[in-house]
């Protein structure tokens, strides 16, 4: 009997063990679809980004007009540009759903996979932020000014650090050039981290909705989950194309249609929708350093989740009180997202502060205590 090439060839064997003959729990739901969707987003963003980079010019006198040139004169430039901009939104939508799934079903107990995932989140956030600066519109310029200025909150070395990042005494040509360089470079780091993420995941195998050991009931990834993932991919691409072709500027900021002007500040500086929750947490503390630390900790807190897990059960599937807290956390994040887009005035300041306190309270105090209570109820 002839041996199958995909099982013997050194390279094909790796692909086979990762995407074809991979033993997968038979009961994983649609929530396990987002990993492959994120992979698809990454590929799409890299391809569209590559074509945009061919026509973009990272000089402050040319950047804005080069983006205009792409959308007007390049063949299908408008499509590539809009797919890249809205693809970022879909990327973050998938990331947040993927992380939410991980929290709900206790996937964070695969510590290495989880930690690499958070590092991926930071890298993607940095990439998205720098990408937003590249069109050199008003919101690009002032967004970059506000966010890079946060580094000055660092004691002693703050101001030096800001000037080092800017490459001068203000945001200028050097800043735009380095942001373009890093925006081009980071996606390849993301690809590398993704491979490590998958490598650690395949050491343990996937978690499943029950949180129980599923070794007794595994099925091959292909054809079962490759087709299931294909459905998710079609739905995601449909959403992306609907956004791109019918509402291309729905998620953008109208201020970015105005070229960057250091002499005119927009009435309300705000980041893209996917950073609004963190921006609201940053603004909820009246102290600069305190705000920056809260902003950092709002993401870094994810590293603590495996340590804060006190339940005897892995998943929240059979824990109704924890479920209520989880959905309260989701609602809280939606409130923070809304507050981040509002001006700094009452009642928004107070709502933002309460929502920020609630965010940390649920994750650090309420969920661990609830898990202990649920353990006692099982006895």
From Swiss-Prot:
Q: How does it assemble?
A: The cytochrome bc1 complex contains 3 respiratory subunits (MT-CYB, CYC1 and UQCRFS1), 2 core proteins (UQCRC1 and UQCRC2) and probably 6 low-molecular weight proteins.
Q: Where does heme b b562 bind?
A: 84, 183
Q: What is this protein called?
A: Cytochrome b
Q: Which CDD domains match?
A: cytochrome_b_C, Cytochrome_b_N
Q: Which cofactor does it need?
A: heme b
Question: Which PROSITE patterns does this UniProt record tie to the protein?
Answer: CYTB_CTER, CYTB_NTER
Keywords, ordered alphabetically? Electron transport, Heme, Iron, Membrane, Metal-binding, Mitochondrion, Mitochondrion inner membrane, Respiratory chain, Transmembrane, Transmembrane helix, Transport, Ubiquinone
Q: Which InterPro entries match?
A: Cyt_b/b6_C, Cyt_b/b6_C_sf, Cyt_b/b6_N, Cytb/b6-like_sf, Cytochrome_b, Cytochrome_b_C_euk/bac, Cytochrome_b_N_euk/bac, Di-haem_cyt_TM
Q: Please indicate which superkingdom the organism of origin belongs to.
A: Eukaryota
Q: How is the cofactor bound?
A: Binds 2 heme b groups non-covalently.
The residues that the entry says bind heme b b566 are 98, 197
* Gene Ontology biological process terms, A to Z: mitochondrial electron transport, ubiquinol to cytochrome c
UniProt similarity note: Belongs to the cytochrome b family.
Membrane topology according to the record: Multi-pass membrane protein
- Residues bound to a ubiquinone: 202
Q: Which residues cross the membrane?
A: 34-54, 78-99, 114-134, 179-199, 227-247, 289-309, 321-341, 348-368
The task this protein performs is described as:
Component of the ubiquinol-cytochrome c reductase complex (complex III or cytochrome b-c1 complex) that is part of the mitochondrial respiratory chain. The b-c1 complex mediates electron transfer from ubiquinol to cytochrome c. Contributes to the generation of a proton gradient across the mitochondrial membrane that is then used for ATP synthesis.
Which cellular compartments is it found in?
Answer: Mitochondrion inner membrane
Q: Which GO terms describe its molecular function?
A: metal ion binding; ubiquinol-cytochrome-c reductase activity
GO cellular component terms given for this protein: mitochondrial inner membrane; respiratory chain complex III
Q: Name the PANTHER family on file.
A: CYTOCHROME B
Major location (coarse): mitochondrion
């Amino acid at each position: 009997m002839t041996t199958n090439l995909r099982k013997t060839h050194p390279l094909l064997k790796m692909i086979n063990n990762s995407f074809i003959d991979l033993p997968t729990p038979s009961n994983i739901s649609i929530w396990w679809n987002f990993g492959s969707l994120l992979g698809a987003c990454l590929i799409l963003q890299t391809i569209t980004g590559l074509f945009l980079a061919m026509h973009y010019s990272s000089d402050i006198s040319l950047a804005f007009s080069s983006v205009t040139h792409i959308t007007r004169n390049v063949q299908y430039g408008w499509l590539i540009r809009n797919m890249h901009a809205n693809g970022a939104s879909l990327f973050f939508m998938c990331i947040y759903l993927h992380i939410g799934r991980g929290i709900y079903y206790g996937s964070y107990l695969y510590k290495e996979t989880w930690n690499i995932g958070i590092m991926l989140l930071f890298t993607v956030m940095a990439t998205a932020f720098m990408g937003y600066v590249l069109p050199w519109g008003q919101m690009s310029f002032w967004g970059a000014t506000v966010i890079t200025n946060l580094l000055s909150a660092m004691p002693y070395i703050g101001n030096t650090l800001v000037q080092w990042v800017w490459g001068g005494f203000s945001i200028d040509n050097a800043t735009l050039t380095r942001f373009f360089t890093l925006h081009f470079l980071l996606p390849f780091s993301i690809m590398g981290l993704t491979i490590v993420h998958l490598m650690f995941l395949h050491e343990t195998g996937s978690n499943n909705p029950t949180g129980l050991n599923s070794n007794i009931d595994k099925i091959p990834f292909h054809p079962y989950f490759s087709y299931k993932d294909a459905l998710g991919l079609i739905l995601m691409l449909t959403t992306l194309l609907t956004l791109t072709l019918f509402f291309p500027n729905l998620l953008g900021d109208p201020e970015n249609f105005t070229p960057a002007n250091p002499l005119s500040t927009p009435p309300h500086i705000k980041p893209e929708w996917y950073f609004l929750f963190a921006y609201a947490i940053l603004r909820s503390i009246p102290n600069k350093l305190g705000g920056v630390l809260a902003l950092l900790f709002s993401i870094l807190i994810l590293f603590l989740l495996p340590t804060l897990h006190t339940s005897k059960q892995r998943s929240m599937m059979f824990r109704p009180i924890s479920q209520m807290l989880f959905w309260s956390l989701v609602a809280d994040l939606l409130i923070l997202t809304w507050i981040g887009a509002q001006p700094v005035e009452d009642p928004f300041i107070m709502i933002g502060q309460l929502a920020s306190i609630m965010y940390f309270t649920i994750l650090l105090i309420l969920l661990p205590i609830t898990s202990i209570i649920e353990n006692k109820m099982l006895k």
